[in-house]
Structure formats: structure tokens, C-alpha cells
Amino acid sequence: MAEGEITTFTALTEKFNLPPGNYKKPKLLYCSNGGHFLRILPDGTVDGTRDRSDQHIQLQLSAESVGEVYIKSTETGQYLAMDTDGLLYGSQTPNEECLFLERLEENHYNTYISKKHAEKNWFVGLKKNGSCKRGPRTHYGQKAILFLPLPVSSD
């Protein structure tokens, strides 16, 4: 190839006909603030725990589109959601409150912003004591909003 030439590739048009589903393994979302794992309980409560053996911390992240994810508890089947007051809760069915914008930060942690409230910059966050931080109380630069996706098994 000569200097200055541009190579273009044709778009992939073939379909792969894969069955629906998510092929990613469940993850644990470890919060930098206080060392808690994000947890969705059967009653819809969302909080953090340091107990790595808790079954409610296993989360399935599935992409809706580029950078947009649903976060679902593998144990309860509930989706992480943020209501109009910025409170986190578990929803039985996926809806617009369950979509989050996932972003990999420079420090290799992930942040999750509620897509519905993206213009307000409401992040998923945990306080040092493990309780949820309301969306309006979160902002960029806080440790409370930094999550590290970890494998479920420690090996």
C-alpha cells in the first residue's frame, strides 16, 4: 500500500442466526467506596454487602445497544432501576428506568448513569456504609460511583 492510500472494507451483511440470550458470565460489581458489592434483594431493595458469598450480588449485564446496559440479578431476576427521585430499586420487568449508560473511566472502573436521567448525570452509587446513594447526590469524581466488574468465582 502506497503512502496516503485509504483502504475501505465492505460492511458485514451476513446474519449469524444466534439464539437470543446473553453469553457473558455473571459479574460482581465491586464499589470503590467502602468495598461493597452491589446487591439486589428479592423485595426490590438495592444496597451493598461485603459478603462475597451472597447469591444476590451475582449480576448479569446485558447490552441493549452500544454503551447501554441492563443490570439483572441472576438470583432474583430483578433489574436494577432508578426512579424519578433517584432511588435505586429492583424491577421485575425491564423498562426505561432500567437502562444505564456504562462508561469505562480512565482509572479502569466503570460508571453507570441512568439513561432516563442522563441529562441530570444521576449515577448508580453506594455510600461507605453500603446503602444506596440517591442519584441527585452523586456526581463525577466521587468514589461512590466507581464500580469494578469482577468474575463471580475468585479463581
From Swiss-Prot:
Phenotype for K133E: Loss of CSNK2A-, CSNK2B- and LRRC59-binding. Reduced integrin-binding. Defective in integrin-, heparin- and FGFR1-binding, and defective in inducing FGF1 signaling, cell proliferation and cell migration
Broad class of the protein's primary localization: secreted
Any Gene Ontology biological process: regulation of endothelial tube morphogenesis
Post-translational modification: In the nucleus, phosphorylated by PKC/PRKCD.
UniProt effect for mutating S114A: Decrease in LRRC59-binding
Pfam families, per database record: FGF (PF00167)
Result, substituting N33A: No effect on integrin-binding
Outcome recorded upon mutating S131A: Decrease in LRRC59-binding
Annotated GO CC locations: cell cortex; cytoplasm; cytosol; extracellular matrix; extracellular region; extracellular space; nucleoplasm; nucleus
Expression by tissue: Predominantly expressed in kidney and brain. Detected at much lower levels in heart and skeletal muscle.
Effect of R134E: Reduced integrin-binding. Defective in integrin-, heparin- and FGFR1-binding, and defective in inducing FGF1 signaling, cell proliferation and cell migration
Superkingdom of the organism of origin: Eukaryota
Short sequence motif Nuclear localization signal: positions: 24-27
Binding site for heparin: N33
Protein location: Secreted; Cytoplasm; Cytoplasm, Cell cortex; Cytoplasm, Cytosol
InterPro entries reported for this sequence: Fibroblast_GF_fam (IPR002209), IL1/FGF (IPR008996)
Record key words, sorted: Acetylation, Angiogenesis, Cytoplasm, Developmental protein, Differentiation, Growth factor, Heparin-binding, Mitogen, Nucleus, Phosphoprotein, Secreted
Region ranges (Heparin-binding): 127-143
Residue numbers of N-acetylalanine PTMs: A2
Family stated for the protein in its record: Belongs to the heparin-binding growth factors family.
Quaternary state and interactors: Monomer. Homodimer. Interacts with FGFR1, FGFR2, FGFR3 and FGFR4. Affinity between fibroblast growth factors (FGFs) and their receptors is increased by heparan sulfate glycosaminoglycans that function as coreceptors. Found in a complex with FGFBP1, FGF1 and FGF2. Interacts with FGFBP1. Part of a Cu(2+)-dependent multiprotein aggregate containing FGF1, S100A13 and SYT1. Interacts with SYT1. Interacts with S100A13. Interacts with LRRC59. Interacts with CSNKA, CSNKB and FIBP. While binding with LRRC59, CSNKA and FIBP seem mutually exclusive, CSNKB and FIBP may cooperatively interact with FGF1.
Protein name: Fibroblast growth factor 1
Organism: Homo sapiens
